């Protein structure tokens, strides 16, 4: 699945590194926030390879990170992999959706690559539909998180940041007073729920950071999600977000 830029390299050892990647979800907020992350690391990140698989639709476009007067004529592809050794980060930017019917196959191959690379932890940036909120979610911050059981120690760190965990709901269709089984509900989240469940099953340390939103101009949602991530990982100074 991973295709390196350098020759004679298959997979790399990323022990101690945090992997950040987006879910293709409502409003494309996770992808926009990932663009902000990569752009904010311009002085320390470099392209190390690509993710290539039949489950990812082919896309090609102009350089998303070109600055006026400094265009290099580079192209962006469906799924690119960047590294910042200084920040101990590996960032995947996925610009294309997953083929219909291939979600399970995509999660399986992506997770196999993640485990081979020995990442310290994985962060998935996502979004969920604001129209499906319950009453408790209508007030306060639209930002939420959830973590797999193996990374529950992060919850104490998130509590210090006053973050709110995504509220669970009664399992549909058993929404009765007698039903006490709860689950995460992620409408519009794309592959988020399936990937989370797979990481939970295989004891992969995963934190999902997400925001409630609707389709439209989602720039503000993306900035909020990136700042949410930045409060935790301290990727860049808040005053320089995306300016590089």
From Swiss-Prot:
At the top level, the lineage of the source is: Eukaryota
The entry's cellular-component GO terms read: cytosol; nucleus
Q: Name one Pfam family in it.
A: PAC2
In which compartments does the protein localize?
Answer: Nucleus
Keyword Nucleotide-binding belongs to the record: no
**Keywords in UniProt for this one?**
Chaperone, Nucleus
Q: What biological process terms from GO does the record include?
A: proteasome assembly
Name the InterPro entries on file: Proteasome_assmbl_chaperone_2, Proteasome_assmbl_chp_2_euk, PSMG2_sf
By sequence similarity, the record places it as follows: Belongs to the PSMG2 family.
- Cited function: Chaperone protein which promotes assembly of the 20S proteasome as part of a heterodimer with psmg1.
Subunit: Forms a heterodimer with psmg1.
- This one is known as Proteasome assembly chaperone 2
Gene that specifies this protein: psmg2
């Amino acid at each position: 699945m991973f295709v390196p830029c350098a020759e004679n390299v298959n997979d790399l050892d990323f022990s101690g590194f945090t992997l950040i990647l987006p879910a293709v979800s409502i409003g494309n907020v996770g992808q926009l926030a990932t663009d902000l992350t990569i752009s904010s690391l311009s002085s320390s990140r470099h392209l190390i390879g690509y993710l290539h698989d039949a489950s990812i639709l082919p896309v090609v476009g102009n350089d998303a990170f070109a600055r006026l007067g400094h265009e290099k004529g580079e192209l962006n592809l469906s799924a690119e992999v960047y590294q910042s050794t200084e920040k101990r980060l590996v960032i995947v930017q996925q610009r294309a959706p997953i083929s219909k019917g291939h979600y399970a196959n995509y999660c399986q191959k992506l997770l196999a690559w993640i485990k081979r690379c020995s990442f310290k932890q994985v962060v998935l940036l996502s979004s969920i539909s604001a129209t499906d909120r319950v009453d408790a979610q209508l007030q306060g911050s639209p930002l939420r998180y959830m973590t797999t059981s193996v990374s529950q120690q992060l919850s104490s760190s998130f509590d210090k940041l006053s973050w709110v965990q995504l509220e669970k709901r009664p399992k549909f269709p058993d929404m009765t007073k007698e039903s006490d089984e709860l689950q995460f509900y992620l409408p519009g989240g794309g592959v988020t729920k399936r990937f989370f469940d797979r990481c939970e099953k295989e004891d992969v340390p995963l934190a999902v950071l997400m925001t409630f939103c609707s389709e439209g101009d989602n720039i503000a949602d993306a900035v909020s999600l990136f700042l949410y991530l930045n409060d935790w990982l301290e990727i860049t100074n808040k005053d320089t977000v995306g300016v590089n």
